[in-house]
């Protein structure tokens, strides 16, 4: 891969960095003030104002790669996007990761990005006009309902939500949780994964359907806190689906029994987008740590001069650089060979990025002493948010298993040779 940014990439990085300096960073205290006033689950005016500015600046729908322009169902839908490659998008997502809520300003936040790609690749023209267009215009938001509290959802074949055919409708029954974004008053639609045929082959039982959030039987049971943070105004919910009826023609994505296929196509880009933003969050934590250490004295000298902190700072810089390069490699592989071929790189970065950032944020918390565990410096909330990414879109253990099995597959001949020798000795 070429480490030199393309002219377009350089231009967008400069433009986005300038937008952050001029608009995002000054808006942080305004965002916090508006968030603290009154109802928690509400639209924040500062975000809506910034969306208009971002759209006018051409910093809109940056996430949608050219590969998303090869839909399996409909290829007539037109949308506004610069159509960046994953590699071109990577440094932009990293910048967005510096302020946790900023990706929404550019219409690049999860779970909407993944849902928009699903609609583009697998939706009918009618589904796109009804849901994708307002999503890409930033008029509504969405949710993805997959994880369930009653089963180990890291194995998607365990999903128990039932999607039963009843004439021209589906009737949906199930319980989901960690349904991100449901608390947002703009959340109008969800993509739900469940089973349409429990007797089919294991990976052909699941389907994905589109469900309006105002459909009768969609019940938000509770909002789930993350280490005490409610993540308002978007949040994560437990949702019960009780006899929810949706028309088959309007709801079904791609076809019955193809939900697992859609999920695999959706989660690859989503995973790497998270990892790109994580690098930005880690950079902020390192900056805060260095600034704190350079201004505090203990035992007669600045804390930054203590050898233990020099080691931690050096390790943080090395780990950030390594993770950034692995991000770029995964993005480049996705662009050149496709998500399936880039499976190893995606799995590696999904394990590496959150663990890297959590270590740096934890060191930054330590550098701030008691203040680090308060909300005064933003480190505790950053830690809480990134800790969820060791679970979201597949836990570390699942991705590590993928890496290990692909590594061990290189030694299949050796294993066969050993078994043959053992069999020979037995004879």
Residue ranges, per PLM feature:
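Short Gly/Pro-enriched turn/cap motifs at secondary-structure boundaries
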Residues: 150-154, 181-185, 198-200, 227-235
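Flexible, small-/acidic-enriched active-site or ligand-binding loops
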Residues: 158, 214-245
């Amino acid at each position: 891969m070429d480490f030199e940014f393309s002219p377009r990439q350089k231009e967008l990085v400069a433009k986005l960095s300038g937008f952050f300096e001029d608009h995002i960073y000054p808006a942080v205290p305004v965002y916090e003030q508006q968030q603290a006033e009154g109802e928690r689950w509400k639209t924040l005016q500062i975000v809506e104002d910034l969306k208009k500015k971002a759209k006018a600046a051409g910093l809109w729908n940056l996430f949608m790669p050219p590969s998303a322009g090869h839909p399996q169902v409909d290829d007539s839908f037109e949308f506004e996007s610069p159509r960046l490659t994953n590699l071109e998008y990577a440094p932009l997502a990293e910048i967005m990761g510096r302020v946790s809520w900023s990706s929404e300003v550019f219409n690049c936040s999860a779970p909407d990005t993944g849902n928009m790609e699903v609609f583009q690749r697998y939706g009918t023209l009618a589904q796109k006009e009804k849901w994708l267009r307002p999503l890409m215009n930033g008029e509504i938001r969405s949710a993805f309902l997959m994880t369930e509290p009653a089963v180990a959802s890291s194995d998607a074949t365990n999903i128990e939500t039932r999607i039963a055919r009843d004439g021209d409708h589906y009737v949906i029954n199930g319980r989901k949780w960690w349904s991100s974004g449901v608390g947002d008053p703009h959340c109008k639609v969800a993509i739900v994964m469940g089973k349409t045929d429990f007797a089919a082959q294991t990976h052909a039982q699941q389907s994905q359907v589109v469900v309006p959030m105002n459909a009768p039987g969609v019940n938000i049971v509770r909002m789930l806190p993350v280490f005490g943070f409610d993540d308002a105004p978007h949040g994560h919910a437990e949702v019960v689906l009780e006899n929810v009826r949706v028309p088959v023609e309007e709801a079904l994505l791609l076809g019955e029994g193809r939900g697992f296929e859609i999920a695999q196509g959706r989660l690859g880009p989503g995973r790497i987008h998270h990892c790109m933003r994580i690098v930005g969050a880690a950079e902020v934590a390192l900056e805060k740590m260095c600034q704190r250490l350079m201004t505090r004295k203990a035992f007669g000298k600045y804390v930054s001069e203590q050898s233990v902190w020099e080691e931690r700072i050096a390790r943080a810089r090395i780990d950030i650089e390594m993770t950034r390069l692995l991000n770029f490699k995964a993005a480049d592989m996705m662009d050149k060979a496709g998500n399936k071929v880039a499976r190893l790189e995606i799995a590696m970065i999904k394990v590496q990025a959150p663990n890297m950032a959590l270590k740096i944020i934890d060191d930054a918390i330590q550098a701030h002493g008691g203040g680090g565990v308060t909300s005064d410096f933003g480190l505790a909330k950053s830690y809480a948010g990134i800790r969820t990414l060791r679970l979201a879109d597949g836990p570390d253990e699942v991705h590590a298993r993928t890496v290990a099995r692909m590594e061990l597959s290189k030694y299949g001949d050796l294993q066969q040779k050993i078994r043959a020798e053992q069999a020979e000795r037995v004879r």
